[in-house]
Swiss-Prot record:
HAMAP family documented for this protein: Ribosomal_eL20
Similarity annotation: Belongs to the eukaryotic ribosomal protein eL20 family.
Complex formation: Part of the 50S ribosomal subunit. Binds 23S rRNA.
Keywords (A to Z) from UniProt: Ribonucleoprotein, Ribosomal protein, RNA-binding, rRNA-binding
Protein name: Large ribosomal subunit protein eL20
Protein's gene: rpl18a
Gene3D superfamilies (UniProt xref): 3.10.20.10
GO annotation (BP), single: translation
A cellular-component GO term for this protein: ribonucleoprotein complex
Amino acid sequence: MAKIIRIKGKIVGKDEPMVFSKEYNVLKESDALEIMYSDMGSKHSVKRANIQVLEISEISQEEVLDPIVRKTLEMY
């Protein structure tokens, strides 16, 4: 069964550190990390070494803040 994973972290190496929180509906935590590294690297042009993961947590459907993840959960 799929899990909802929230990843909190920051991007360093730019002019100012950027703090972020991302949510993913995935089967494993490692899948969520891979998607996050890919997304953040392509959108912000940073290397994986410049992305610091501060927290990884599994959350319930009621805790989801991302509207896209929420809509996909409502479909099933």
